[in-house]
Amino acid sequence: MKASMFLALAGLVLLFVVGYASESEEKEFPIELLSKIFAVDVFKGEERGCKGFGDSCTPGKNECCPDHACSNKHKWCKVYLGK
């Protein structure tokens, strides 16, 4: 029952993406779609001086963007959740 509901939802999402892709004429469609879904501007790291999600960093330095934090364990920028 859960699997069939998941497949139905996944099918609707796929239908939405295909419909949106057929209307979109831009070449940056996947990046545009993901940035609209997550409302995060992670894909334009070249335009800013801070490091975005997944970029390597040094703990203790303020290299990551304001909404990210450097992980002491993995040494890359993660989304800061305020914990």
From Swiss-Prot:
The modification Leucine amide is found at L81. This is Mu-theraphotoxin-Hhn2l. Belongs to the neurotoxin 10 (Hwtx-1) family. 15 (Hntx-3) subfamily. Expressed by the venom gland. Pfam families: Toxin_12. Residues 22-48 form a propeptide. One of its GO terms (cellular component) is host cell presynaptic membrane. Lethal neurotoxin. Selectively blocks tetrodotoxin-sensitive voltage-gated sodium channels (Nav). Does not affect tetrodotoxin-resistant voltage-gated sodium channels or calcium channels. It is found in: Secreted. Keywords: Amidation, Disulfide bond, Ion channel impairing toxin, Knottin, Neurotoxin, Presynaptic neurotoxin, Secreted, Signal, Toxin, Voltage-gated sodium channel impairing toxin. SUPFAM superfamilies: omega toxin-like (SSF57059). The keyword Signal applies.
